[in-house]
């Protein structure tokens, strides 16, 4: 899976640019790290890539995943997530139970909820992790 950023930049609603445009290609199998002091825009950049910015911000440039432009796709269709530095899980719950918190409230019924969780685990190649 490759990720490419082409002149990606973020501005505020008052037209203040938060960082210089970013151009980078991260090829399949490569790992990249965003580093810098507090307040320089690391989280904002990652949120722009994932499509999680509020309407108070404007994004210009392009985000490509596997060569496909995803810049204007809804968050769910981008298939891009953020791994936070600190765990955001409930340590007393299983992997499956933690994932249940992320399900839409429209998924009603234990069997349907379990099926969606198992499908997500399978997509992540973690199908044996439900009860861990």
Predicted feature locations:
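Helix-to-loop junction immediately C-terminal to a conserved catalytic motif
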Residues: 50
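The feature captures the beta-strand-to-loop junction immediately N-terminal to the Walker
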Residues: 35-37
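Conserved ABC ATPase "signature" region
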Residues: 69, 111-130
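Conserved hydrophobic segment flanking the Walker A/P-loop of ABC-type ATPase nucleotide-binding domains
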Residues: 26-28
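Short coil-to-helix segment of the ABC ATPase nucleotide-binding domain corresponding to the Q-loop/switch region
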Residues: 93-102
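ABC ATPase NBD coupling module
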Residues: 54, 68-84, 110
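A short, flexible loop at the N-terminus of ABC-type nucleotide-binding domains that lies
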Residues: 1-21, 53-56, 72-74, 107
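Conserved ABC transporter NBD signature motif
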Residues: 58-68
């Amino acid at each position: 899976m490759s990720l490419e950023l082409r002149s990606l930049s973020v501005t505020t609603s008052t037209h203040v640019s938060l960082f210089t445009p970013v151009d980078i290609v991260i090829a399949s199998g490569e790992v990249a790290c965003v580093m810098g002091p507090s307040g320089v825009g690391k989280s904002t950049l990652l949120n722009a890539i994932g499509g999680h910015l509020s309407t108070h911000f404007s994004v210009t440039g392009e985000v490509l995943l596997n060569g496909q432009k995803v810049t204007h796709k809804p968050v769910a269709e981008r298939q891009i997530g953020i791994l936070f530095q600190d765990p955001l899980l409930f340590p007393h719950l299983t992997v499956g139970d933690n994932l249940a918190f992320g399900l839409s409230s429209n998924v009603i019924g234990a069997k349907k909820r379990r099926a969606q969780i198992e499908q997500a685990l399978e997509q992540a190649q973690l199908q044996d992790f439900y009860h861990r």
